[in-house]
């Protein structure tokens, strides 16, 4: 059978289910594919297939993730669902599957539980911009007041972590009913349809990488006699055009220069775009003025920083990480984009040590500046071996 052509005519949005174990994330994921296949004609995926999620490697970390796709009237959704709590932690911190919005699944019968809270906190830390709530198993709750109470609890919890709790859409229903094609009191199929319509309206269309301000991590520097200095790398976002000013940020004082040429596969171009590997010729910049690990950016868009708070996952021994815990004052290398910089770790109040396999918030102070923004991913390494993964939660200075 020939592969179907990937339709580019609908905007593409990445979502995922989050929430406490056994509250119905995977059932809802399967129900979404079923309802969308009937209403909008996308493919249906069964529960068992999603539940036995394949292993993936992201930054050397093993993560089990199931990817499904479904369509609404106006969009194409790529949806991630993880079987275990540890998989969520790793997934969100490494950014293996970055979400434009999350569906928080909470059982109406149980209310918010520890992982409900933890997933909301993680979403805040790693920069998931929007959360929509599906209050599941509502067919098991006869008391309308109880439903209202759970809804209030969820709203309070969202507000605690700086999400707009009062304005967050909450859909009440039963994923299992929808999966089985039932719809008593509009709690099954109708509720899931309502959820998809909510995703369409509440989660804005993500800005495409090409529309964001230009940024290219520098991987290599060459000097070409008679032409000047060329830096190479893969354009992360935006577009660089000839004769535009750019800044070189990180590791040293920020320098301004001008792009005088863009080359790709030995061909001269007028511009380099997001996703392309290219060489950028810099006017008046000497070979020794630039090094791997710096970034080329649109002037004024990204600043160099040394201190930030981060959410970090520490690899377990089985994943090839450390065999022993670390303590405050730990000084590993932080690998940002293309280079390592040594940094000092401050642990939260009352935390004495961090065990392999833990996730932890920490404050890091680097010995050199790095071009960084909230949401930037990094690896933690010791002598070239990855021992952790993290994301910048908030830049401090």
UniProtKB/Swiss-Prot annotation:
GO cellular component, one term: cytosol
CDD domains: EF_Tu, EFTU_II, EFTU_III
Binding positions for GTP per the UniProt entry: 19-26, 81-85, 136-139
EC nos: 3.6.5.3
MF term (GO), any: guanosine tetraphosphate binding
Described function: GTP hydrolase that promotes the GTP-dependent binding of aminoacyl-tRNA to the A-site of ribosomes during protein biosynthesis.
Quaternary assembly: Monomer.
Name the record gives this protein: Elongation factor Tu
């Amino acid at each position: 059978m020939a592969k179907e052509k990937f339709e580019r005519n609908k905007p593409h949005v990445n979502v995922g289910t989050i929430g406490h174990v056994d509250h119905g994330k995977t059932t809802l994921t399967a129900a979404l594919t079923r309802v969308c296949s009937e209403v909008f004609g996308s493919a249906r995926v069964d529960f068992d297939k999603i539940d036995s999620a394949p292993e993936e490697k992201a930054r050397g970390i093993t993560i089990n993730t199931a990817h499904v796709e479904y369509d609404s009237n106006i969009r194409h959704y790529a949806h991630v669902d993880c079987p275990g709590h540890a998989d969520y932690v790793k997934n969100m911190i490494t950014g293996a599957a970055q979400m434009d919005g999350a569906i928080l699944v909470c059982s109406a019968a149980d209310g918010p539980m520890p992982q409900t809270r933890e997933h909301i906190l993680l979403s805040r830390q790693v920069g998931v911009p929007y959360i929509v709530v599906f209050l599941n198993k509502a067919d098991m709750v006869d008391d309308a007041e109880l439903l209202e109470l759970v809804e209030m609890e969820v709203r309070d919890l969202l507000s605690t972590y700086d999400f707009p709790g009062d304005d967050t859409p909450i859909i009440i229903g039963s994923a299992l009913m929808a999966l089985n094609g039932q719809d008593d009191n509009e709690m099954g199929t109708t509720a899931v349809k309502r959820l998809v319509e909510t995703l369409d309206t509440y989660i804005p269309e993500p800005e495409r990488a090409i529309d964001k301000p230009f940024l290219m991590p520098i991987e290599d520097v060459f000097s070409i006699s008679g032409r000047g200095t060329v830096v190479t790398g893969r354009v992360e976002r935006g577009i660089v055009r000839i004769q535009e000013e750019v800044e070189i940020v990180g590791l040293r004082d920020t320098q301004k220069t001008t792009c005088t040429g863009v080359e790709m596969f030995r061909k001269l171009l007028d511009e380099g775009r997001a996703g392309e590997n290219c060489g950028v010729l810099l006017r008046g910049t000497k070979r020794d003025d630039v090094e791997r690990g710096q970034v080329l950016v649109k002037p004024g868009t990204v600043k160099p920083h040394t201190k930030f708070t981060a959410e970090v996952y520490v690899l377990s021994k089985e994943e090839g990480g450390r065999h022993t815990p670390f303590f405050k004052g730990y000084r590993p290398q932080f690998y940002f984009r293309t280079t390592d910089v040594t940094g000092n770790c401050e642990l939260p109040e009352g935390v004495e040590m961090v065990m392999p396999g833990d996730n932890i918030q920490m404050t890091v102070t680097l010995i050199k500046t790095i071009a960084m923004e909230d949401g930037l991913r990094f690896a933690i390494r010791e002598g070239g071996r990855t021992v952790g993964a993290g994301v910048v939660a908030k830049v401090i200075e």
